[in-house]
Amino acid sequence: MQVLVRDNNVDQALKALKKKMQREGIFREMKLRGHYEKPSEKKAREKAEAVRRARKLARKKLQREGLLPMKPKPAFGAERGRPGAGGPGAGGPGAGPRGPR
């Protein structure tokens, strides 16, 4: 895999490399090959992935046909983890430990 470095801008080249690797699925492959996966576990994982893909395809089809509402786009800054976004795990004033469990 090749990435051009323009004007000695290594940060931009690294960003482009990570994007290419993500698109090619290299990170996912590395994670899967990080430890041995039993054939039965591999089969179960692949089956679950196929079910997930089929559900997603069916959901998209229903949305296109107008039988399901389209997923609303989040308001600007309302993404999870952004400052001032609110919601679970967002922090903010009064955010502290959850307390005893």
UniProtKB/Swiss-Prot annotation:
Name of one Pfam family that matches: Ribosomal_S21
Coiled-coil blocks: none
Region named Disordered: 36-101
A GO biological-process term: translation
NCBIfam families: S21p
Family label: Belongs to the bacterial ribosomal protein bS21 family.
Biased amino acid composition, Gly residues: 83-101
Keywords per UniProt: Ribonucleoprotein, Ribosomal protein
Classification via InterPro entries: Ribosomal_bS21, Ribosomal_bS21_CS, Ribosomal_bS21_sf
Name of protein: Small ribosomal subunit protein bS21
Gene Ontology CC terms, in alphabetical order: ribonucleoprotein complex; ribosome
PROSITE patterns, alphabetized: RIBOSOMAL_S21 (PS01181)
PANTHER family per record: MITOCHONDRIAL 28S RIBOSOMAL PROTEIN S21, SMALL RIBOSOMAL SUBUNIT PROTEIN BS21M
Compositionally biased tracts (Basic residues): 53-62
Taxonomy, superkingdom: Bacteria
Ranges of biased composition (kind: Basic and acidic residues): 36-52
GO molecular function, one term: structural constituent of ribosome
